């Protein structure tokens, strides 16, 4: 089986393997092409051995490369009050970082 890890970043958890491309919440102080290290590894599987962290796995890191900054799909919030001619339409697009996972160190 293929090795994978579960990491936590931006209050979300992602299951990643080498070569995966994921969109994560914005991180401070990173630029395109720069290496990103995710040190909050909650779970690892290397094909035969399972490591479960309490809360994180010791000495396990996931390294990735920042590919680009992307924006998510537009979310529309619409509210109105009937018979009062009141309505508001608000749109929001979340900013993300697109990261390619390059290495799992277990």
Swiss-Prot record:
Tagged with keyword Methyltransferase: no
What are the recorded GO MF terms, alphabetically?
rRNA binding; structural constituent of ribosome
State any GO CC term: cytoplasm
What the entry lists under InterPro entries is as follows: bL21-like, bL21-like_sf, Ribosomal_bL21, Ribosomal_bL21_CS
PROSITE patterns linked: RIBOSOMAL_L21
UniProt keyword annotations, A-Z:
Ribonucleoprotein, Ribosomal protein, RNA-binding, rRNA-binding
Q: Does the keyword Isomerase apply?
A: no
Please provide the Gene Ontology terms (biological process) for this protein: translation
Q: Which domain of life is it from?
A: Bacteria
Pfam families, per this entry?
A: Ribosomal_L21p
Family affiliation: Belongs to the bacterial ribosomal protein bL21 family.
- Protein task: This protein binds to 23S rRNA in the presence of protein L20.
What does the subunit section of this Swiss-Prot or TrEMBL entry state? Answer: Part of the 50S ribosomal subunit. Contacts protein L20.
Name used for this protein in its record? Large ribosomal subunit protein bL21
- Gene name of the record: rplU
């Amino acid at each position: 089986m293929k090795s994978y890890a579960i990491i936590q970043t931006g209050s979300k958890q992602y299951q990643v393997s080498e070569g995966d491309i994921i969109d994560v919440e914005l991180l401070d102080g990173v630029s395109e092409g720069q290496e990103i290290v995710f040190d909050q590894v909650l779970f690892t599987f290397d094909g035969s051995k399972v490591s479960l962290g309490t809360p994180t796995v010791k000495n396990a890191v996931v390294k990735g490369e920042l590919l680009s900054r992307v924006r998510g799909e537009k979310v529309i919030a619409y509210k109105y009050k009937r018979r009062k001619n009141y309505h508001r339409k608000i749109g929001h697009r979340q900013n993300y970082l697109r990261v390619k996972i390059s290495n799992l160190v277990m």
